[in-house]
Amino acid sequence: MAENLKGCSVCCKSSWNQLQDLCRLAKLSCPALGVSKKNLYDFEVEYLCDYKKIREQEYYLVKWRGYPDSENTWEPRQNLKCIRVLKQFHKDLERELVRRHRRSKPPRHLDPNLANYLVQKAKQRRALQRWEQELNAKRSHLGRITVENEVDLDGPPRSFVYINEYRVGEGITLNQVAVGCECQDCLLAPTGGCCPGASLHKFAYNDQGQVRLKAGQPIYECNSRCCCGYDCPNRVVQKGIRYDLCIFRTNDGRGWGVRTLEKIRKNSFVMEYVGEIITSEEAERRGQIYDRQGATYLFDLDYVEDVYTVDAAYYGNISHFVNHSCDPNLQVYNVFIDNLDERLPRIAFFATRTIWAGEELTFDYNMQVDPVDMESTRMDSNFGLAGLPGSPKKRVRIECKCGTTACRKYLF
């Protein structure tokens, strides 16, 4: 029996912080939890729970890191050295007072509902900070990820796993390319047209790494078999996200969104859309479930035929949080690198214009490409595409909230 259980694990019913609380309360050291004899009696402010003012003296109810709520204490302002925690507490307090149509100046005593809100906000912020750390630990790309929610008390999404590349479903194989280019300079002196030429297509980028192909034309990058190195100008998408991005909570009912923290030049690569690769049959089954939930993250890979779909509902990268717009600043391209199966392209987003720091990133879930272009990139009826007359896939009409002057009122 013991041999069968070897290597097994179960989820703990208590959080890491709760276990630390129990250790300190029982005066037990536990190196695995970071509780030792040296820090058993350390006092660090985790967050502030309440506020009051008595005879012009300010007091704060302190939650001490590693200690249960029963050990919270009221402390005068001069005893607290946690400047950032204090500033954040008052920022949250003032914002909530304004939201409740009161003065922004704090009262002498907080009512219980307001104090409870500030506690929940502090707990949420810690949860989002842990999620941000987790995302950055898992990312393989240069661009950092930050997380913000100044709108409501929603925390990290449940059951979402950050991945950097496709997660291949059962029965699906990504075949590795057998040959690569032999170019000395893939941009200025390509041999046989480099990798794009070998597939009878055009070179995709200029010397700044900006795409110069029309939307709908495929991108063929150099692969792991090529003689060129990492700095080759035909290696752009494979280098991953280069910009610092922020996952933020929208204030207009669109849930989470993504904005850039840096200027992005027109035609520059921004991110890939990754998730689970599943068959279209499985996508149809999941799509019916997602429709009932009022959301879907299905993206059909129908560059040549509709056989496979990318599902980013539970496995994906930051593109999972990018919202729709009828006037988007991102454009979809099909990309081929180490796998040349045209039924399984990688999906890349490029900037349609200069995007300034602080702007939200969006793409059109119902994107249409000129049907005259035989190399069309059709994002389908599942994720947003749609446009094929007589498509057998029926989707629930979802109201559009993009708010642009070009808004079509419905996503599908």
Swiss-Prot record:
Q: Which UniProt keywords apply?
A: Acetylation, Biological rhythms, Cell cycle, Centromere, Chromatin regulator, Chromosome, Differentiation, Metal-binding, Methyltransferase, Nucleus, Phosphoprotein, Repressor, rRNA processing, S-adenosyl-L-methionine, Transcription, Transcription regulation, Transferase, Ubl conjugation, Zinc
> Region (Mediates interaction with MECOM): which ranges?
255-377
**Which residues are Zn(2+) 1-binding?**
C181, C183, C186, C194, C195
Q: Which residues does the UniProt record annotate as the domain Post-SET? A: 396-412
Domain remark text? Although the SET domain contains the active site of enzymatic activity, both pre-SET and post-SET domains are required for methyltransferase activity. The SET domain also participates in stable binding to heterochromatin.
What is this protein called in UniProt?
A: Histone-lysine N-methyltransferase SUV39H1
**Which residues make up the binding site for Zn(2+) 4?**
C326, C400, C402, C407
Instruction: Give the GO biological process terms.
Output: blastocyst hatching; cell differentiation; cellular response to glucose starvation; cellular response to hypoxia; chromosome organization; circadian rhythm; determination of adult lifespan; DNA damage response
Whether S-adenosyl-L-methionine counts among this entry's keywords is yes
Where is this protein primarily located? nucleus
Where do the annotations place Zn(2+) 2 binding?
C181, C195, C222, C226
Pre-SET domain residues: 179-240
Activity regulation here? Negatively regulated by CCAR2.
**Which residues bind S-adenosyl-L-methionine per the record?**
R254, G255, W256, Y297, N323, H324
Catalytic activity from the UniProt record: L-lysyl(9)-[histone H3] + 3 S-adenosyl-L-methionine = N(6),N(6),N(6)-trimethyl-L-lysyl(9)-[histone H3] + 3 S-adenosyl-L-homocysteine + 3 H(+)
Residues modified as Phosphoserine are: S391
Places the protein is found: Nucleus; Nucleus lamina; Nucleus, Nucleoplasm; Chromosome, Centromere
Q: What happens when the gene is disrupted?
A: Mice lacking Suv39h1 and Suv39h2 display severely impaired viability and chromosomal instabilities that are associated with an increased tumor risk and perturbed chromosome interactions during male meiosis. They also show a higher level of histone H3 with phosphorylated 'Ser-10' and a reduced number of cells in G1 phase and an increased portion of cells with aberrant nuclear morphologies.
